[in-house]
Each structure stands twice: as C-alpha cells, then as structure tokens.
Design a protein with these regions (language model features):
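Short, small-residue-biased leader/transition segments that mark boundaries at the very start
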Residues: 1-5
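Conserved acid/base catalytic micro-environments in cytosolic active-site loops
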Residues: 6-252
Length: 252
C-alpha cells in the first residue's frame, strides 16, 4: 500500500480529477485486500493520555457540538490519523471524503475497526450522536439538518457541487445553517477548493475551524484556499489536529 500516497500530483498540470480519484480509490481497495494483520479494535492504551484529555468528561456544550470533516486526495489516511486519537465519547462527527460509490462502506468499516468511536456509512435519518462518525456515501450529497434539539443527516442524489458528489461545501454549508456556532469544521488534504466556501460560512456563524497545514498534506489545495480566504481559525499539522480539536471541546 506504500505507493498509494507516495507522489504529490502537480497542480499546475491539467488533471482529470475524477480519473485520478478513481485510480486512487482502486489502489486503496487493492491495499485493503492485502493480508495484513490488523487489530479488531485499537486498545485505549495505544492512544496517548494527553490526546484523550486525561479521560475527563466533555461538558454539555461539547456534546451539543457537530464536528464536520472534509477531505479529498490523501484524506483517507489523514482522516484516520485524526479519528484514531479521539476517545470513544467524542461528540458526533460527520465526514465527507471524495470517494466513488461502493468504496465508502468499505472505508467506514475499516475506520470502525481502527478507531475508538463507532464509524458507519451514513443513511438518511441517521442521528449525529456522541461516539459515532458518519461517512457520506459515495455519489450522494450529505447535509446536516436540525431535528428539534438534535441533528441528523440527509443523504440524497443531487447535482455535483464544486465538481463533487459528495461535496465538502454541501456538508459545511449545511452545518453552518443547522448548527452555527455549535460546530467545528476541519478541512484536510485535497485538490481544488471544495469546502473552502462552506468552511468560511461556518466561521462567519461562529464555528471553530481547523485547516491542515501544507507540510502534512498530500495536496495542499482545499486547505490552502480555505486559509487564503480567511476561513481557517488555526492551521496545524495532521498529527496535531486531534489535540487541537480536543482542547477546543474541553474548553466548552
């Protein structure tokens, strides 16, 4: 699997993004079929105590927070790096990763094996709950909607937005509308600008926003645009995103 993310594409070249992503996902599929021993579940001892905030409980305001993550090229492993360091009772997370139909279920299952939180491919009507991560299904848009004092997701076959379905902009804009200041947006490695405008909407509504830095990105595209338009509150390395997120949640 070592060749999957080895080379960073030249963004100055004319690239058929869909072809590139499909090739990437095919490699991920091949890698996932390799006979590599993987623990059924990560042991809590494997996560640094500092990353877990000393196992102290989150406050009520934290549990009312919606965490949204958006990523593209290189994002499958980057998102794993963030999620695996979060404790099992972390507030609900929604993720849009650019992936073709048929791959997101497999990806969610892999994350579920490797993370403390429960991870599943999202279905319309799924509630955003403590300890659970919902992955946008391939070839579907995913929005967050408010249902009373709770949040759920709506997955639908709409038009492509920012050239993508699922689109990070669709997710982030819906979180801005539904949760406003009670949300966190994280934009990670990826080509293009999908998610930048949606993250700016979140920030304008009072959300805390995090961008992955250039050094740790496979492609510093989406986070770069978000940073340049003022959508990012703090920009950090992929390995530090979980710590920054937890520090924010414990402060609520």
């Amino acid at each position: 699997a070592s060749d999957v993310y080895k080379r960073q594409p030249d963004m100055s070249m004319s690239i058929n993004t869909n072809t590139f992503l499909n090739t990437l996902m095919s490699k991920i599929f091949i890698a996932s079929r390799a006979k590599i021993k993987v623990p059924a579940k990560v042991s809590p001892a494997a996560v640094p105590v500092a990353a877990l905030g000393g196992n102290k409980p989150f406050g009520l305001n934290a549990y009312n927070t919606v965490i949204a993550i958006g990523a593209s090229t290189g994002g499958t492993e980057a998102t794993l790096q963030v999620l695996k360091d979060l404790p099992a009772d972390t507030p609900g997370i929604v993720v849009t990763q650019h992936m073709p139909e048929g791959f997101t279920k497999m990806y969610a299952d892999r994350l579920n094996r490797l993370c403390h939180m429960k991870v599943k491919e999202a279905q319309s009507g799924d509630l955003i709950e403590r300890g659970q991560v919902l992955i946008a299904p391939g070839d579907f848009q995913m929005k967050v909607v408010r249902v009373g004092n709770r949040y759920s997701v709506n997955c639908y076959s709409g038009e492509k937005v920012s050239g993508h379905r699922p689109s990070v902009d669709v997710l982030f804009q819906s979180v801005a509308d539904a949760a406003g200041a009670s949300s966190v947006g994280i934009i990670m490695t990826g080509m293009g600008r999908d998610g930048a405008d949606g993250l700016l909407s979140m920030k304008k509504k009072g959300a805390f926003t995090i961008g992955q830095d250039a050094e740790s990105c496979v492609v510093y595209g989406m986070p770069m645009v978000a940073y340049n338009i003022g959508a990012v509150v703090t920009q950090v390395s992929c390995s530090n995103i979980s710590n920054v997120l937890l520090k924010h949640l414990y402060s609520l």
